[in-house]
């Protein structure tokens, strides 16, 4: 986040500064300014983060059915009316056996277990 605004950029274009409050490195990038780059083949469970055209941050974890990076990118990019998430930019985190998530928001609770022991994660808390 820079000045309270989330963004996704290339590592070579990133530079630490006082107005950066949080940064994570991951990849590959799935959607870059509305375009999908060439991505590796192969299906797996996936974890990703995207930023919609109106600045909302979406954390995504697939469950049940493995998916290719290309299909994940397509679903993150396309419109809500087409069943997508309308992300202008998105990137993948580690997937496969380490894909997992936990969320508890009011009366909603979600727990997706992975097969691998995870020592690092990304946490989101209310202000």
Give the ranges of each region predicted by the language model.
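Gly/Ser/Thr/Pro-rich low-complexity, intrinsically disordered segments
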Residues: 1-127
